[in-house]
Amino acid sequence: MAVPKRKTTPSRRGMRRSHQALGVEAHAECSNCGEMKRPHHVCSHCGHYDGREVVAAGNSGKGLKTAVRA
C-alpha cells in the first residue's frame, strides 16, 4: 500500500488547497422589477427573463408559459 514518505508541510498543503476557495456569487439587477437575481436566470420575484414574462408571477416556477421569440 502506498504511504507518504515525508510529512506534507503546511505551506505545501496550503498551496494545494489554494484553488478550493469559494467565490462570491454573481448577481444582477432585474431590468423589469429591479430585484437582485442571478445572471442568465429567470427573476424569482416577477418571472421575467430577457425582457418578457416567462413564468406567471407568484407561481414560483410552476406552469411555465410558452415563450414566443420575437
UniProtKB/Swiss-Prot annotation:
UniProt record similarity statement: Belongs to the bacterial ribosomal protein bL32 family.
Pfam families for the chain: Ribosomal_L32p
NCBIfam families documented for this protein: rpmF_bact (TIGR01031)
GO terms under cellular component: large ribosomal subunit
Record has Ribosomal protein as a keyword: yes
Protein name: Large ribosomal subunit protein bL32
Keywords associated with the record: Ribonucleoprotein, Ribosomal protein
